[in-house]
Amino acid sequence: MSYAIIGFGNIGQALAKAFARNGIEVSVATTRAPESFASAAAAIGPGIIPKKLADAVKADIIFLAVRFGPHSDVAKALPTWRGKIIVDVTNAYGVPPEELGGQPSSKAVAQAFTGARLVKGFNHLVAAVLEQDPAVHGGRRVVFLASDDDAAAAEIGTLAENLGFSPIKLGGLSEGGLLVQARGNSWGRLIFKDLVKFD
């Protein structure tokens, strides 16, 4: 299984640190040349591999960690995303709900990435929290997942556990996606909730 993070701002780097912490190799890409962020990637760890966008999207599981607006530009990198899992880490800050047809922002992302199996997740934590070791006082930091594809959600749940988190599935995008979205000025009830689960 191969992994990529598209977007290397605060959230993208926080995700990369989670992969590095657990010795899992991941490609990172932006719309810029990989040389422009190679030193930042190297500072996180040797398993963080800078790539061109066209190469990074060959991965099996892709974390979309860009601002909401450019997600449609990233979606144009491939004619079809069939067979790939997209983890939507975006938040539609300031995007009026009417621009999204009243639907969850994750539904709009799913429509842009034709054929992909989309899982909404890892977006409800701010970067400063997401980048921390998720092992907290004997428990594990919670990440919420929502998807219309149960098998994809299960796969990302396993990955989340391998990264040290405790995944909680919220159901489909229309229900669970609404709970963890920041869309326009209406925020879901679970957005930015930093919770720890004790087994």
Question: What do these predicted regions represent?
Answer:
Residues S27, P97-L100, S166:
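Structural/interface elements that position substrates and couple domains in central-metabolism enzymes
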Residues M1-S39, A43:
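NAD(P)+-binding Rossmann beta1-loop-alpha1 motif at the extreme N-terminus of oxidoreductases
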Residues G45-I85, V89-V95:
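Rossmann-like NAD(P)-binding element
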Residues T90-V136:
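Rossmann-fold NAD(P)-binding glycine/threonine-rich loop
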Residues R140-D199:
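Active-site-lining helix/loop region of Rossmann-like oxidoreductase modules
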Residues M1-S2, I85, V142:
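Residues that mark the start of a beta-strand
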Residues P50, R117-N123, I168-G172:
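General beta-strand structural signal in soluble alpha/beta enzymes
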